[in-house]
Regions:
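Short, small/polar-rich motifs associated with maturation and membrane association
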Residues: 1-252, 256-268, 280-282
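Extracellular/periplasmic, surface-exposed regions of secreted and cell-surface proteins
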Residues: 53, 270-279, 284-289, 295-308, ...
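Short, ordered coil/turn segments that flank beta-strands lining enzyme active or ligand-binding pockets
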Residues: 100, 277, 319
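Acidic, glycine-rich flexible loop segments
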Residues: 190-213, 228, 301-337
Length: 668
């Protein structure tokens, strides 16, 4: 809004009508290692406020971005509670780098972020992402969480309890349609056929001897509850400010057993204080604890299975509904058993996230006017993630009614035997250190100069192990297992077992004249441990320029264009890199024990590869792919040209971009 002065003249009540100020509409947006006024941005940067995001209710902030930022695509692959099976990309070029409060973090951490804690999100879509180097080829998503402000303490609570239900379920055939279709299929067999169901089978359903099975009603619940509660407290003084929040979320799946569900706890604290003149200390701490519970069989297989069953055969062999039926069911699989953890077993996925950062900022302008606009910032961050997973397969029996003897035949469902327990443990950590010097100052009201120079070091580690054991007793503990066939091993995927490090020198300089002519250049000299010596460092520069036509005197003098608050032309070009798909491919490695022939069992013609030494069989080791020390990151050369329009005091905004992105060096 526009500033407005009003004389008090002894009045105790003053009514003031505020007017929109287009300059205030030109808000501050977050960019790489800093902020800029939207009107001064020369890159393709889009932003959305947290308060606008939460208008769309969803457990995943990633979904809340759908349709809100041009060029950002979000698609949801599954609605199963807690899976977060989503993907997003910037301009169709792969998953972007996620930066939360200045710290690179994973997509999983962003998905579990409490949306009520988000202040704003900016997306760098063009060469402006070059300052993030070898991980910015697909763009950058910058997330800023809420901070406290000076003033009275404010309490906030937001809660909801909602119900979800399928929009429409598939309509099942009645038994007569089903039997007719089976008969037609059999009779039209190329080799000739016969009736599968006789007239007596049709009559059994007509007279009530046999009844239709409504698998929809047996498996799918009418409604699935979901609840969310968030509470926050914020406030502070001119020197000390704080924001503290807690959140709880619970979502149940659509299975009637209730064994498909997800719950999450969030905690966040952002505190800043001025410890001395011009010296500010900031501490940010957050924690996430979540748990996803599922039946042992995947939701996809459960739904696929009950669709195959039809309506002709019952879920239970006895009228009382205590004995699970297998007779007549496809592959003898009973969907009721598959969806019920007490019968067939369960899987639990527990994750705990701890994130922290400590920042010390010095404003040298507080000591002398000569250094006005010069600040230095040092930050250290430590993140830790722990996963504790269980998979318990439980042996169970199924039954079939024998009409001749009037008894029930019992047998173990083959795929449930023997009972089995698997435990998995993963831990991942990240340390990050940043030191930056920033300068931002305007001379003679027309020359604005800004810049940043800094150094960044990051180390990441991942470790894991798992154990699998067949059980002598059907109880979810490894101690109940037998010694034969037990397994203890590690996952060796790129995201499971790793040690990685990055270092970088970063820089940016901005210049604007009369807030009309804008220039920016930035770079990142980035190093990655994923490559061999001599190939670890790369230089990633970018340049951009802008012209704010709406600030030109000739433009402002045209009365019919008074409604235009902003009209800006901009262009950028830069080189970005990506090392995400690479994993020390320059180093020699071996696979042990060696596998060949049947890769699933690690054997060849029934025998594991190896040799006999001293009467003992020794498994063989086989070399991995031939190492290549010349492997390095692939590059993305990006050109973007566009314009931004804003009119009628922000009531209408239009952005247009043409971009071209050329990738080189990517493996075929």
């Amino acid at each position: 809004m526009k500033d407005k002065e009003e004389k008090v003249n002894g009045r105790t009540t003053i009514n003031i009508i505020m007017e929109t100020d287009s300059k205030m509409i030109d808000e501050v947006v977050v960019i790489g290692y800093g902020t800029q006024r939207r009107g001064s941005v020369t890159g393709a940067v889009s932003a959305v406020k947290g308060q606008d995001m939460i208008k769309t209710k969803n457990e995943n902030p990633q979904n809340m971005l759908t349709g809100r930022i041009p060029g950002l695509r979000v698609w949801q692959k599954s609605s199963e509670p807690g899976t977060f099976n989503n993907s997003f990309d910037v301009r169709g070029m792969g998953a972007p780098l996620i930066i939360i409060d200045g710290i690179p973090r994973s997509t999983e951490e962003f998905q579990r972020l409490n949306a009520m804690d988000i202040d704003d999100i900016s997306v760098l879509k063009d060469a402006s992402a070059a300052i993030y180097g070898v991980r910015a080829a697909n763009g950058v998503v910058l997330v800023t969480t809420k901070k406290g402000g000076a003033g009275k303490t404010e309490f906030s609570y937001n809660g909801s309890y909602t119900f979800q239900q399928p929009s429409r379920m598939p309509e099942l055939c009645d038994p007569y349609e089903s039997m007719t279709l089976f008969n037609e299929m059999s009779m039209n067999n190329i080799n000739g056929g016969s009736w599968v169901f006789s007239e007596e089978s049709f009559e059994a359903f007509r007279n009530g001897t046999r009844r239709t099975t409504d698998w929809n009603d047996l498996i799918i619940s009418n409604v699935a509850p979901q609840t969310q509660h968030d509470i926050s407290i914020s406030g502070g003084t001119e020197k000390t400010k704080f924001y503290i929040s807690m959140g709880y979320f619970y979502q149940e799946g659509i299975f009637r057993s209730g064994d498909l569900n997800y719950n999450k706890f969030n905690l966040r604290s952002n505190i800043s204080t001025e410890i001395a003149k011009g010296i500010k200390f900031e501490l940010g701490v957050s924690g996430i604890s979540d748990e996803r519970n599922t039946p042992y069989t995947s939701s996809q297989d459960i739904i696929r299975n009950y669709w195959r069953q039809g309506v002709l055969y019952p879920a239970y062999a006895d009228p009382e509904g205590t004995m699970l039926n297998y007779n007549g069911l496809d592959m003898e699989q009973n969907t009721v058993a598959m969806m019920t953890a007490d019968i067939s077993g369960y899987k639990k996925y527990k994750q705990k996230y701890f994130q922290s950062s400590a920042t010390l900022t010095a404003d040298f302008g507080e000591y002398t006017p000569v250094l006005k606009g010069l600040t230095a910032k040092a930050m250290f961050s430590y993140d830790y993630r722990a996963d504790n997973n269980e998979a318990f397969r439980k042996e169970y029996y199924q039954y079939a009614y024998d009409e001749q003897t009037g008894t029930y035949k019992q047998k173990v469902y083959n795929e449930s035997s023997p009972s089995n327990m698997r435990r998995e443990f993963y831990d991942k950590s990240q340390m990050l250190g940043q030191f930056t010097v920033n300068y931002d100052r305007t001379f003679n009201d027309v020359h604005h100069v800004g810049g940043v120079i800094g150094w960044e070091v990051q180390k990441r580690n991942g470790d894991n192990f798992y154990a699998v054991r067949d059980l002598a007793f059907s109880m979810p503990y490894l101690l109940a297992g037998v010694t034969e066939g037990q397994i203890g091993a590690m996952q060796t995927g790129n995201n499971d077992l790793y040690e990685q490090a990055n270092e970088a020198l970063i820089g940016r300089i901005n210049y604007s004249f009369a807030d009309r002519y804008l220039l920016e250049a930035q770079f990142r000299y980035d190093g990655s441990s994923k490559f061999a010596k001599g190939h670890q460092w790369g230089f990633f520069p970018s340049v951009s320029a802008g012209w704010r036509i709406s600030e030109e005197p000739f433009f402002k003098s045209i009365d019919v264009l008074k409604f235009v608050n902003q009209l800006k032309l901009r262009a950028s070009y830069g080189v970005l890199g990506d090392d995400g798909d690479l994993n020390y491919d320059w180093a020699m490695g071996y696979t042990y024990p060696s596998t060949s022939g049947n890769m699933a069992n690690g054997d060849y013609n029934g025998y594991s590869p190896g040799y006999i030494f001293g009467g003992k069989f020794i498994s063989a080791a086989s070399p991995m792919a031939l190492p290549n020390e010349n492997i390095t990151w692939f590059k993305s050369k990006t050109f973007d040209i566009g314009f931004d329009f804003e009119g009628w005091d922000g009531l209408l905004g239009v952005s247009f971009d043409y971009f071209n992105r050329l990738r080189t060096g990517r493996f075929a």
